[in-house]
Amino acid sequence: MRAVVLRNGKVTVRETTDPVPGQGDLLLKTLSTAICASDVHYMDHPDLAINDPTGRSLYDPDRDIVMGHEFVGEVIGHGPGCSDAFPVGTRVTSMPIRLVDGGAGGLRIIGQHPEAQGSFGELLVVPEATAKAVDGAVSDDAIAVVDAFAVGEFYVRSSNMQPGEIPIIIGAGAVGLSAVAALTARGIDPIIVSDFHAERRELARSGFGAHILVDPAQQSVFDVFRQVRAERHLAGCAVVFECVGASGLIDKIVAEAEFCSRIYCAGGWYTGDTLSITEATRNGLTMQFGGGPMPQDWYGVLDSVVAGTLDPLPSVGRIIGLDEVPEALDQARRSEGPPRIVIHPNGDL
């Protein structure tokens, strides 16, 4: 098959070995797949995957790795032991994991392990155990970005926001927008969004329901928080969703955050970063790194997208073919372009 292949630190579009469905696997024709910032992190920080003690990810420079973990596909084949739940022609998606020995041996992240090849190719293998059929008229591209929106759902659910608390979203990329969408679905008001890019700030409001937009080059988001809290006579703390992952940002938030803020670090891999425990202690902060999305978040968001109660498509700004992926990955590395770029590996643009 043709695919975007990572090998020895280089990304090329070429032929690679077709995936073969194993016991209980479905073989899919990839219909739509999205680029995520974690694809770039995986490429740029291979040492983290070479030395991943969990075994969930692995970077091997001497093996072809097909990245991509946000996808939807059409069933075109079955491995041994599959049921009849997903006939040929069924449109399916899945959480991006492959179970090892039915889960007894852990799991692999699809698109971040040579034994769990990803969706930046014409074909893809997923476990029947995690697959879910996609019915209805919802577009392939909307399904392809479910994973990103499940991230925001997970962090917002984990935050357990209380009356009087004010959410602050730092970064209006796909994950930041997903957090805005999850807050909006819960009727939270006000929602403060901070991003350097005016277009992304406006998308957070027009596409997903944010109320107050902040340009961090012009003013501190925490100054805005204090002003809003005073104007609305709210007594709750700040609940911060950090959705950027830039080096040094967490430490800056820790230093500037209001007393007793809760901080949810959704931005990704904080490679080599440090933070001041002294400042965090003085400010009485609660912090969470990673941990999701969980299946209830992922499949719950999928159900919402299929039902039409969540429309993630405003986050999609480009649809490309495989040949354009290397350039698009570089664009994502620079935090340029739309929040989500979607790929149609089989050419239906």
Model-derived features with residue positions:
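NAD(P)H dinucleotide-binding glycine-rich loop of Rossmann-like/cofactor-binding domains
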Residues: 57-64, 69, 96-170
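C-terminal hydrophobic helical "lid"/dimerization subdomain
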Residues: 227, 251-255, 295-349
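Mid-domain Rossmann-like dinucleotide-binding core that forms the NAD(H)/NADP(H) cofactor-binding site
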Residues: 136-218
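Glycine-rich beta-strand-centered segment in the early N-terminal region that forms part
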Residues: 19-33, 48-98, 135-137
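Glycine-rich phosphate-binding loop and adjacent beta-alpha segment
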Residues: 188, 244-307, 345-349
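Short SAM/SAH-binding signature in class I
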Residues: 237-241
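Short amphipathic alpha-helix with an adjacent loop that forms part of the alpha/beta core around
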Residues: 219-234
